[in-house]
Amino acid sequence: MGAATKLAFAVFLISCSSGAILGRSETQECIYYNANWEKDKTNRSGIEPCYGDKDKRRHCFATWKNISGSIEIVKQGCWLDDINCYDRNDCIEKKDSPEVFFCCCEGNMCNERFFYFPEMEVTQPTSNPVTPKPPLFNTLLYSLVPIMGIAVIVLFSFWMYRHHKLAYPPVLVPTQDPGPPPPSPLMGLKPLQLLEIKARGRFGCVWKAQLLNEYVAVKIFPIQDKQSWQNEYEIYSLPGMKHDNILQFIGAEKRGTSIDVDLWLITAFHEKGSLTDFLKANVVSWNELCHIAQTMARGLAYLHEDIPGLKDGHKPAISHRDIKSKNVLLKNNLTACIADFGLALKFEAGKSAGDTHGQVGTRRYMAPEVLEGAINFQRDAFLRIDMYAMGLVLWELASRCTASDGPVDEYMLPFEEEIGQHPSLEDMQEVVVHKKKRPVLRECWQKHSGMAMLCETIEECWDHDAEARLSAGCVEERIIQMQKLTNIITTEDIVTVVTMVTNVDFPPKESSL
């Protein structure tokens, strides 16, 4: 009877434990603090929203030091799926005298307060006599407990292996390349030296670095932005992502240990930087505008295209979801290439597109349907959102073009003239959705035949009706035709002038073809 009672009590404990797991609190926000905020160029403190896969748990963490009785916080923020944090409502460090104290917990803002309660060995009292156990019970106990312990260890080890494998792919540098150049060796075998910071963005900073005898770009993500780093790595690793108008991917790495882990993404380096930086410092001629716009449209059209039967597999259609001039880089010959795939979505037949939160991207470039939160979560809807943003980038190019007779404006971001440099979501909704305004297309642009056609193309890209927008492939073809037409018009003007001066009749251009 005693053994049966113990067995029933054990089952009751397991049931209670399962109920506690099912009733766990979800972590949505954590207290954020970074003691090295000046060095890392981040905010010092605040509230950090936690993001992650739906099937993984999110936690808060805190790290601190005890220096002569004075508590110094090192970092606080969101923590990724960690079994050691499961079902902990309070942030408590239990290790005995660690050099750096660490605790994690589950629940909103649960890291606001943190504690140190070292585990103490409890001495069992010996005054009470021990009730002798029946021989059969002892035999079962000594036989089953080791077996169950080994089984638990094996299962836990397998779970940890799977968890680690999914979180950090074991081989992060591509070992196969569908064409030239030949595949690079593992990044770990090459010396990589960071030289200078070139840009900062929502998910990290970009460094110019030296890899052997060539310059590369290194985008460094903090561990909190692992999801963006992993998404960008996965997009670059898809079949068919080697393209002249998509930023060349070199490799990815995890650097550092423990809580000071940084995630690196290594790509080709382009000295001219982003289209934003280039337009701030330079004006463009009509031919330069056409070349930049055409290669940008070609890159986006390739990204949007579903291409089966490639040598290295099936390339799915991909929506960028953060098209803007900052994410268009320029090579030395002004060829555009599209970068930054941290928010990109791939569309594979029979598979979910993954994380499809509606309002993502840069507010200034958000399409009306995104600002309204009225997105149709289908592939074509996401591709049309990219095309709206592309219309704004084409406007930026037009605003700095010297083709028209009028003055060239100082560089401004889309809607900067209407609502300034730091618009809120409400500002964008009011201007774009309710008033249906768009950046101004100058009257003087209409006097140039090519610019007039470009203005028409821009208006069809940012149309309020998403289904009426042009595709990226159509924009590419239009720009090619625009450039050809303006070259013909220019040539005919020259022929007319020469005829008037020399009084020599030239055959019409059609007869010379």
From Swiss-Prot:
Catalyzed chemical reaction(s): L-threonyl-[receptor-protein] + ATP = O-phospho-L-threonyl-[receptor-protein] + ADP + H(+); L-seryl-[receptor-protein] + ATP = O-phospho-L-seryl-[receptor-protein] + ADP + H(+)
Record topological domains on the Extracellular side: 20-139
Pfam family, one: Pkinase
Active-site residues per Swiss-Prot or TrEMBL entry: D322
Gene3D superfamilies: CD59, Phosphorylase Kinase, domain 1, Transferase(Phosphotransferase) domain 1
Alphabetical list of CDD domains matching this protein: STKc_ACVR2a (cd14141), TFP_LU_ECD_ACVR2A (cd23631)
Segments crossing the lipid bilayer: 140-160
GO (cellular component) term, any one: cytoplasm
Domain Protein kinase: 192-485
E.C. designation(s): 2.7.11.30
Disulfide cysteine pairs (residue numbers): C30-C60, C50-C78, C85-C104, C91-C103, C105-C110
Main location: membrane
Membrane topology annotation: Single-pass type I membrane protein
The keyword Cell membrane appears for this protein: yes
Sites where the protein binds ATP: K198, A199, R200, G201, R202, F203, G204, C205, V206, K219
Cytoplasmic side: 161-513
Subcellular location: Cell membrane
Signal peptide: 1-19
Keyword terms of this UniProt record: ATP-binding, Cell membrane, Disulfide bond, Glycoprotein, Kinase, Magnesium, Manganese, Membrane, Metal-binding, Nucleotide-binding, Receptor, Serine/threonine-protein kinase, Signal, Transferase, Transmembrane, Transmembrane helix
Record family assignment: Belongs to the protein kinase superfamily. TKL Ser/Thr protein kinase family. TGFB receptor subfamily.
Function: On ligand binding, forms a receptor complex consisting of two type II and two type I transmembrane serine/threonine kinases. Type II receptors phosphorylate and activate type I receptors which autophosphorylate, then bind and activate SMAD transcriptional regulators. Receptor for activin A, activin B and inhibin A. May modulate neuropeptide expression in dorsal root ganglia (DRG) neurons and ovarian follicle development.
Entry protein name: Activin receptor type-2A
Organism: Gallus gallus
Gene from which this protein is expressed: ACVR2A
